[in-house]
Amino acid sequence: MHFLLEICVDTYGSAVAAIQGGADRLELCSALSEGGLTPTVGLLRQIKQYLSEHDPPKTIPVYCMIRCRRGSDFSYSEQEMNVMLWDLQLLAQHGADGFVFGALESSSGKVHLEHCGQIVAAAGKLPLTFHRAIDCTDEQRLEENLNLVAQLGFSTVLTSGLKPTAEQGIDTIAKMKAIATDIEKVTGKSLRLMPGSGISSENALKVIQRTGCDAIHGSASVVKSSDNETRTLPMGASNVDALPLKVCSTAKVQELRRSIDSIVKK
């Protein structure tokens, strides 16, 4: 059995590091410091070019985040939806292999059928992951929301089990996995649960074994060392630009890969 390792990246260098480290799939974003926003077409094209230049070409899927702004409400206006639908169309035209999206109703916290349905329709046959918007929903509506996600046509749910980290939400993820199994038995719709947030080589094995999931998501990042002596200034109210830059580490990805692959060997 092969366990899927997805690495989220927001720079070209991080994408290359993830690929070289053994990632099975990339979640491509911009601004991971903001939780991940829609990436640029230029970044996607550069990564796809890197993959195509190998002999034979590497076939690592690149799923693009569709999220036009920061914020944990995941409730969007009609105009914001139009922005994201345009972005999706452009990214699909330039080689995106799948998309990552989530939207909730502002009044109920329920999965937004209309907005998610628009994205599913625009994606066509390309697969979709419902992102950690699911972690901002009410636990009492978890079964209902997972059924809606499956009904819409999403193939994967990225989750930390409604907690800040997947390790903290491990019991809820196991519950979600059981719900997904029941959904498939009743409807025939397969919904893969993929734990993410705070995943490392130290806890990946525990999370997979305790939840029964066959996929895991992480950033495998380290603080980038820099000899740059340029004076730093805040470029916004949050002062994020003054913080150290985090990038994907090939060594960290390899550690994660070895950790989850050890399950198969046991």
Model-derived features: where do they sit?
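Glycine-enriched alpha-helix->loop->beta-strand junction motifs that scaffold or abut catalytic
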Residues: 19-26, 51-52, 95-98, 122-126, ...
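Short helix-terminating capping/connector loops at secondary-structure junctions
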Residues: 1-2, 55-59, 185-190
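Hydrophobic faces of well-ordered beta-strands that scaffold small-molecule active sites
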Residues: 3-9, 26-28, 62-66, 99-101, ...
